[in-house]
A protein has these predicted regions:
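ATP/NTP-dependent adenylation/nucleotidyl-transfer catalytic domains that generate, transfer
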Residues: 1-72, 76-296
Length: 296
């Protein structure tokens, strides 16, 4: 602010604000590289990090086996792939992976995948007893997005194989592994990806990952995220859906502490949340409410 006087002339004016289109493309899946070659390279790197992280935990705890509860969802598929890689790194037999099938879902598909990978299968059983008998490390398969939103929980003693993997990235990691796999594993992975219930990254999860990325990686506020999401998703996501995803993310980040299991960190988006339990999200909530009022 410059006061009048002292040779200063103030000339008030006004001009209309016009919305301008973004001059760059915005990806709806910021965790997934757009370039196919880079995507394959990144997938190999992330899978390798996951496997080496699990290898370190097995060696550190002196575990002779890995105990993984599995269903027919893509989180379980990815966790099985990581476990198989880990045993290869350790020079151990893949039978040291104890896959415990859970009730529900397509159990036959789970059994075929386990057979193709060469891992041991146990029916729904006493996991604590199995862990003691085989000196096995308890594992958990839920991805980062499910844990962040509270859709899944892990036992305190479990190691989260996918706890740093956003849900929108799970499918691409499995697809990259399917490209390099041989039969019959390739067929089983493609069957898992094409299953009717395999769309684990619907629009709501894609919006959650999108909002989280731009909040943590870029420090964007709700109004900016809304504009970016409009450009990224177009007609696939209404403004109300975007604001709903931001509100859910706000509740999860600020109103309850994140309960993530032990896991290896991936990427540079601070997905391994060390979120202060007394953090307040009032500014975010107020801006989201203001945006809702503007749109009504």
């Amino acid at each position: 602010f410059v006061p009048e006087g002292a040779g200063v002339r103030v000339a008030p004016f006004s001009m209309p604000l016009r919305p301008t289109a973004l001059s760059r493309a915005v990806s709806p899946h910021p965790f997934v590289p757009d370039d196919a070659a880079l995507r394959r390279k990144r997938a190999e790197l992330l899978l390798s990090i996951q496997a080496h992280g699990l290898r370190k935990r097995l060696l550190h705890t002196g575990s002779r086996a890995a105990l993984l509860p599995v269903t027919d969802d893509l989180d379980s598929v990815l966790a099985l792939l990581v476990c198989a890689r880990t045993m290869d790194l350790l020079g151990r037999a893949r039978h040291d992976v104890l896959a415990v099938t859970q009730p529900g879902g397509d159990r036959a598909r789970v059994l075929r995948l386990c057979k193709a990978l060469g891992v041991s299968v146990r029916p729904n059983a006493d996991r604590a007893g199995l862990a003691r008998t085989h000196a096995a490390l308890p594992l958990a398969a839920p991805d980062f997005t499910a844990l962040l939103l509270g859709e899944a929980v892990c036992a305190p003693e479990a190691y989260g194989v996918n706890a740093a993997v956003p849900r929108t990235l799970v499918r691409w990691l499995i697809a990259a592994e399917a490209e390099r796999a041989e039969e019959p594993l390739r067929a089983e992975l493609r069957a898992a990806l094409s299953a009717p219930d395999a769309d684990c990254a619907g629009i709501s999860c894609a919006l959650t990952d999108f909002c989280f990325y731009h909040l943590v990686r870029c420090g964007a506020h709700p109004r900016r995220i809304l504009r970016l999401a409009r450009a990224a998703f177009g007609d696939a996501a209404a403004d109300a859906d975007i604001l709903r995803a931001m509100a859910a993310l706000t509740r999860c980040l600020f109103r309850r502490p994140a309960a993530l299991p032990d896991h290896v960190a991936l990427g540079s988006s601070a997905q391994a949340l060390h979120w202060p339990p007394d953090a307040a999200g009032s500014l975010w909530g107020e801006e989201i409410d203001a945006l809702r009022r503007e749109l009504t």
